[in-house]
Structures are given as structure tokens and as C-alpha cells.
Amino acid sequence: MKNKKSFGFPMMEEMTVQTVRQYLEKKNSVILPVGIIEQHGYHLPIITDALTAREMAKMVAKKTGILVAPVLYSSFSGGGLSGTINISPSVMSLVINDTLVSLASQGFKKIYIFLGHGGGENLNVLEISLKVLLRNNPIFSDVVLALFPVWSFDESGRGWKKAV
């Protein structure tokens, strides 16, 4: 896979349909970074949560060769300062569910969700969504879904090894 040689780890958004298929012939794991566009005071960029999730995913991908899916930039923060883009918890649940169904239907059997937003409201929405999805959708009968808040990793990125 050309992408893996160029970057040292596979990034789905940089791949072609064929290279994703080639990846799935060898591996069935994917990391889904989830962040939000929101304020972080006046000293940090509004993309901080999404960047954190993406960079942690890249760090893990570099060590494991697991594919990194494109970042989901929309989630719920409850904040309203300039630059914050909120979606409702119900829409967040739908976006997550549809994304996971899409990945599972393509053949991904191990999906690791890296949550970059530190607010408990996103964690709650994701936990409930995953439980309902696993219970009600037969496509997930042989799929492992694992949720990792990135703040549970240490400074070297350890913490993800428990499930990967």
C-alpha cells in the first residue's frame, strides 16, 4: 500500500477504494477519531479536541498499522462561544451509528473510537449509542466496538493496548 510507505501508517482519507480493499484483505481494524469544533479559552485553536483524537489515532496507527478513519468533527459540547459548532445529542448518535454501520458493512470487525472531547455529555451519548447499536443491529454480532476517551491515555499514548 503506497500510503503506508509514505506516512508510516494508513490514513483512510488518503487511500483509494482499491487500497482500502487491500487493507481489508489483511486487517479488519480501524480507529475512528471523534472530536468537536469548540472553544478552548482564548489560547488554543477551536480544533483542539479533534486534533487530539486524530494525533492519538496516528500515534497508535504508527505502532500497530491499524487504519485511521477520517475524523468526525461534529459532536455536542453545550458551549456557545464564537467558533463552537454543536450538533444535538440525538444527531450525534445518528452520525455515530451511521458511520459505524458503514464501517462494519465494509468488513471492519474491530472499531476503536478515540473520543477527543473531554465533556461527559459526549461520552454518555456514545456509550448509550453503542449499547443500543450492539443490541439492535445484527451486523454487529461479530464486531468489536471499543470506546477510548483520549484523556485515559498516558503521555506516550499507552492506554489503548487494553483492547487493541
PLM regions and their residue ranges:
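A generic structural signal for well-ordered alpha-helical segments
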Residues: 24, 60-61, 103
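Short coil-to-beta-strand
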Residues: 26-33, 64-74
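A non-catalytic, amphipathic alpha-helix used as a structural packing/dimerization or gating element
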Residues: 26, 55, 94-98
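Histidine-centered active-site/metal-ligand motif
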Residues: 40-43, 117
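Glycine-rich loop at the start of a catalytic domain that most often binds anionic cofactors/ligands
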Residues: 43-51, 83-86
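Short catalytic helix/loop segments, enriched in acidic residues and glycine
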Residues: 49-61
